Amino acid sequence: MISFIVTTYNLADWLLRRCLTSIVAQGLARDEYEIIVVDDESTVSPRHVVDEFATQVNITLHIQRHKRQGAARNLALCHAQGDWVQFVDGDDYLFEGTISPLLHIAEKNNLDLLMFGFREVHDDSVKRIRIENNWSFNISTGDDYMLHHNLLGSCCMLMFKRILLDDSQYDAPLRFTEGIYIEDEEFATKLVWRAQRMAKIDTVVYAYYQRAGSTVHSRSHEHTDELFRNYIVVLERLLHFESSLGDNTHDGFTRKVRTLAVDVLRRSLREPNWKERWMDSVHQLRSLGVYPLPAVHYSMKYSVFRFLTMCAMGRRILHWIEKSQNRL
């Protein structure tokens, strides 16, 4: 069985209805899945939307006092009964008929975790995509994957075994850090590192809906300040975890942490007050020991970026590049 965990906060009815409809349309038998909806104390409860699906599927609704998405997901994990877990944000959806083939691949190959593709969408239609029967993939450890690929900091593109969260070989269960943005970055990095058998399939499964006013697109000064503070919090927590790994293989984990520092710098370069934001970010990253960026050839892009950060003219070039790309 797979547990679909859906988080909501002040969503329009049609968005949540579209999300839940896409889960029901996966072609799974009723006893093969459950839907756990957690609402973060919306102004208007989504119960009437959830009740529309009560006769079709095993679905439950939980209400929490406004604690943000990390706490909502943790609450859902406490109630999850499935062998597998799939997160879906309430304003996103899954392309029809994609999850069942993924489950077959994951179980046939004894995977701990399966990563898949996504597509940005900007309308209200559930599009269909062609599902290939013979998907190609390579199996590796999570750490080896992160050593050779950039890991997207979103847990919604990861279908994983629930037992991976509470594996007895680790000191504590894996849960989301609560009360912050970008909680996905920490959770996804630790989760993928735990996977001994994982695969990445490029097939598009997840529809990532772009809407004005979402937390990832908010541009208020207060939100931007908090976002940068949260990046530092996540980096601190990942570095602390890294220091506890000892002899465990974690070269890929280290690469992910270093590239997350690059993300902070790139975001700094996109800001209107980019020079001040850059200096503040450098100060914070230096105090954590992740700046200057290490001279490691993770990729050509990383090496070029690192080289350009070392002089004022290089930073101006990077600012121009990031500003140009951000307009697209």
What are these regions (language model features)?
Residues D39-H48:
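A conserved acidic beta->alpha catalytic loop
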Residues M1-S3, S22, E34, E186:
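Cell-envelope/extracellular polymer assembly enzymes that use nucleotide-activated donors
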Residues L11-Q26:
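Short, well-formed alpha-helical segments that are part of the catalytic scaffolds
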Residues Q69, G90-A199, Y208-D225:
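Donor-binding/catalytic cores of nucleotide-activated saccharide
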Residues Q64-R73, L77, I180-Y181:
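A short, glycine-/small-residue-rich helix N-cap motif at loop->alpha-helix starts
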Residues V85:
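Short aromatic/hydrophobic "clamp" motif used to bind/position activated sugar donors
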